[in-house]
């Protein structure tokens, strides 16, 4: 193992000089024994100097300190010993429950599986959330993005999906907290603990208060753990909250390394960095990774380069809308903006497809009529349009649902609605079977039978 010395420190960027015949490779991990800090090589500047990013705080460092090259990229613990544990970007335990005791460590930088190893999936993954199962169904082994601005419910939706899928699906899960609030990480841990599924979840956190190097690499740490489970032939769920913070950490690192920014100040390597991560989140013939990723949308602009780059990699996109949240309809998922590759009669069957498209066409017609209603009022509409508006308003409310994870705040018990029930309810609404019920009966209920029961109480 060769050793060098620090020659320059600028925040999280540290330049280290090595003998010219022992210059570290890009992505090699270097260790500063004093302060126990790990650095990752990003650039070779020539004359034996390498530019590195600190995976931890660089406070207290000084020029001339000795640095040792480990001659390999960062390695993190993998395997069943990681389950039920909380780790940082380097795989060190941060839950005060002793060492991980892993039998194997794997490099966080790996190639994506070869094309011939990949496996397509047609199997649907039922979530129990009406609007998702109906309009943007998830595929087992697929990639899902939850897009939304600040405060429209990305994390709550993700928590509900974890609650519904991780409990129903008896497989293993990996949760990567990338640049999100420490409180949310804490909430998630206790949520898992209370529901007795914590021993099936590995948690990796690089939260908001950490240096950019940690936030940039923590997604890869979580992914490496998920890949190990997949390569053992298991079906694993990977939750990433939040992909935007991964991009943002890349922007910070890119600026610190002195690269020219591209559009909106993002790093010039945005598409490549996203591709490196997303291409590894995939299912092979041995096992599957089903991933759910929250994507923050800056200023509610879906054309921003970061969310726009993420779109290309996903099978299902769930778009959360501020307008729907403002109406008090939760989950605030936009059924017209959200899409899925699975919404195909060959995959989901003809009945489901026709009901989903029927719901979308009624809501689209209502959207078009809103301007006329605002100017002239409901009375000027034709009888057919009046009927469409009334049905659309009922459908809108029926797309809402009480969540298990929000029980503490709402006081109403959460509901898991099976797909068959969802299709039956919306099919009846489109056919006009429930035109006589008041629209308030459809708000915040589970299945259609509950809506009928609620209507009886309202009378």
UniProtKB/Swiss-Prot annotation:
Keywords linked to the UniProt accession: ATP synthesis, ATP-binding, Cell inner membrane, Cell membrane, CF(1), Hydrogen ion transport, Ion transport, Membrane, Nucleotide-binding, Translocase, Transport
Pfam families according to UniProt: ATP-synt_ab, ATP-synt_ab_N, ATP-synt_VA_C
Main location: membrane
Matches recorded under Gene3D superfamilies: 2.40.10.170, Bovine Mitochondrial F1-atpase, Atp Synthase Beta Chain, Chain D, domain 3, P-loop containing nucleotide triphosphate hydrolases
Chemical reaction(s) catalysed: ATP + H2O + 4 H(+)(in) = ADP + phosphate + 5 H(+)(out)
Gene Ontology, cellular component aspect: plasma membrane; proton-transporting ATP synthase complex
Keyword Transmembrane helix annotated: no
Membrane protein topology class: Peripheral membrane protein
Residues reported to bind ATP: 148-155
SMART domains (UniProt xref): AAA
Localization of this protein: Cell inner membrane
Keyword Nucleotide-binding set for record: yes
Gene Ontology MF, one: ATP hydrolysis activity
Similarity field: Belongs to the ATPase alpha/beta chains family.
HAMAP family: ATP_synth_beta_bact
Protein's recorded name: ATP synthase subunit beta
Gene label: atpD
């Amino acid at each position: 193992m060769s050793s060098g010395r620090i020659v320059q420190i600028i925040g999280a960027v540290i330049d280290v000089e090595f003998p010219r015949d022992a210059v570290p490779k890009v992505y090699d991990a270097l260790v500063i024994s004093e302060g126990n800090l790990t650095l990752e090589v990003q650039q070779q500047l020539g004359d034996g100097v390498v530019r590195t990013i600190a995976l931890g705080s660089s406070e207290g460092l000084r020029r001339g300190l000795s640095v040792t090259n480990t001659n390999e990229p960062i390695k993190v613990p993998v395997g069943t010993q990681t389950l039920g544990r909380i780790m940082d970007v380097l795989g060190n335990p941060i839950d005060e429950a002793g060492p991980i005791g892993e039998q194997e460590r794997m490099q966080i930088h790996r190639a994506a599986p070869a094309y011939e190893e990949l496996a397509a999936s047609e199997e649907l993954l039922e979530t129990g959330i009406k609007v998702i199962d109906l309009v943007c169904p998830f595929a087992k082994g697929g990639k899902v993005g939850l897009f939304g601005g600040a405060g429209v419910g990305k994390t709550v939706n993700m928590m509900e999906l974890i609650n519904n899928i991780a409990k129903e699906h008896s497989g293993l899960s990996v949760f990567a907290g990338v640049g999100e609030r420490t409180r949310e990480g804490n909430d998630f841990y206790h949520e898992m603990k209370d529901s007795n599924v914590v021993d099936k979840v590995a948690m990796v956190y690089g939260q908001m208060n950490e240096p950019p190097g940690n936030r940039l690499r923590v997604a890869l740490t979580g992914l490496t753990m998920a890949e190990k489970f997949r390569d053992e032939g298991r079906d694993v769920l990977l939750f990433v909250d939040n992909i935007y913070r991964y991009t943002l950490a890349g922007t910070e690192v890119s600026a610190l390394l002195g690269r020219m920014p591209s559009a909106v100040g993002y790093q010039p390597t945005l598409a490549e960095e996203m591709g490196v991560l997303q291409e590894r989140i995939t299912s092979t013939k041995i096992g599957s990774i089903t991933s759910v990723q929250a994507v923050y949308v800056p200023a509610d602009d879906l054309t921003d380069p970061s969310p726009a780059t993420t779109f290309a990699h996903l099978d299902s996109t769930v778009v959360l809308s501020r307008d729907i949240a403002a109406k008090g309809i939760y989950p605030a998922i936009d059924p017209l903006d959200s899409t899925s590759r699975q919404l195909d009669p060959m995959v989901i069957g003809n009945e489901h497809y026709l009901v989903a498209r029927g719901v979308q066409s009624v809501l689209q017609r209502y959207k078009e009529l809103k301007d006329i209603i605002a100017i002239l009022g409901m009375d000027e509409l034709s009888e057919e349009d009046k009927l469409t508006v009334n049905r659309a308003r009922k459908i809108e409310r029926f797309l809402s649902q009480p969540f298990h994870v929000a029980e503490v705040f709402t006081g109403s018990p959460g509901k898991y609605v099976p797909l068959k029930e969802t299709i039956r309810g919306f099919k009846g609404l489109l056919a006009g079977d429930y035109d006589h019920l008041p629209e308030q009966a459809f708000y915040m209920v589970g299945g259609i039978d509950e809506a009928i029961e609620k209507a009886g109480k309202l009378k």
